[in-house]
Amino acid sequence: MEMMIKKFCQRYRLPEKSLHELLSHMTEYHFGKGESIVKEGERNSNFYILKKGIWRAYYMIDGTESSLWFAGTGEIAFSSWGYVNNEVSQVNIESVNESIAYGIAKPDLEELFNSSIELSNFGRKIFEQIGRAHV
């Protein structure tokens, strides 16, 4: 857990106290190797922080999987289509190996953003990065 906290706080420049506040509102989930977290064509607006393991996002082209990104310990993962636009996901997100993640539903996370300037700034930075990536 300490490694995850250190990596997360370094990567996202969030004070440890604020991360602990966020984690206290999240649920711990366990996923098996190859297990789907988000399926293409389904709506999922949850926000995840990986405690352990590796996830990947991919889409299918003519029956072939094309990977978009990988996320590991201390990183975030979510369907930007589901979270940002409440649309169905254009990608699949799966657990590459046994993994543990903390998850929170969009309404609960937005409530936290409204209650903490540090968490609000964290959220703004994340979604600004996504906006730049989709331009």
Question: What kind of region is each of these model predictions?
Answer:
Residues M1-V135:
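Cytosolic regulatory regions built on CNB/CRP/Popeye-like sensor folds
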